[in-house]
Design a protein with these regions (language model features):
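Membrane-embedded alpha-helical bundles that constitute the cytochrome b-like, heme-associated redox core
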Residues: 1-206
Length: 206
């Protein structure tokens, strides 16, 4: 079941990103800005004139993304191909990378929370979208902010559920339920984070 849901959701995300990217190419919206020297991690907003905190925030984002990528490869490679759980070195790498991701995610939450709050205009835009009303917005950050908060929210159950599995007070059935929570919230975290970074990269080259 989890294998099928993972394949389906990753396929939908990939197709959605591809269609969205191609539609932007048709409108000429994905060309990099001219006369601008792009840093090798410039896609995350890195600039030489940033302060120390600004550079740390962007480095934390890169570290969080890379660590989540490592955890995704170790976790989903076996499940997607042979529907098997992690064992051996894959499990060790997954567990060893998790603290790096958590520390980076907490730092991102603390430092980006204020900038990612929804403005009055963005709240009105969100309500309009929920009511299926057409809204014309230019350079809206609504999707970027929503995916940021969604990823941060899913980080909590994804982390706590796997820690709780280590305690026997939940019983066998409870531990199986917690593993399921960890798997599905982890999948949601990967999907939201991937889409969030795609939106950031696309906005940078828009």
């Amino acid at each position: 079941m989890f294998q099928s849901i993972s394949w389906a959701s990753l396929t939908v995300l990939s197709l959605g990103i591809l269609i969205h990217f191609c539609s932007g190419l048709g409108k000429g919206e994905t060309k990099p800005k001219s006369n601008t020297k792009i840093h090798f991690i410039g896609w995350c907003g890195w600039a030489e004139d940033l302060g120390i905190l600004g550079k740390l925030k962007r480095l934390a984002g890169v570290v969080a993304f890379l660590s989540l990528l490592v955890m995704s490869l170790t976790a989903f490679s076996g499940r997607l191909i042979s529907n098997e759980l992690m064992t051996g070195y894959a499990l060790m790498i997954h567990v060893g990378t998790a603290p790096v991701f958590l520390v980076s995610a907490v730092f991102l939450l603390v430092t980006w929370a204020h900038q990612c709050r929804l403005t009055d205009a963005e709240r009105a835009e969100l309500v309009a979208h929920l009511c299926f009303q057409h809204v014309k917005t230019k350079d809206s950050l609504l999707l970027i902010k929503l995916t940021f908060w969604g990823a941060m929210f899913l980080t909590i159950p994804a982390s706590l559920s796997i820690v709780a599995v280590m305690f026997t007070i939940f019983g066998t059935h409870g531990q199986e339920l917690l593993v399921g929570i960890h798997q599905y919230t982890g999948l949601g975290l990967v999907l939201l984070t991937s889409f969030h970074f795609y939106l950031i990269i696309r906005r940078h080259f828009k």
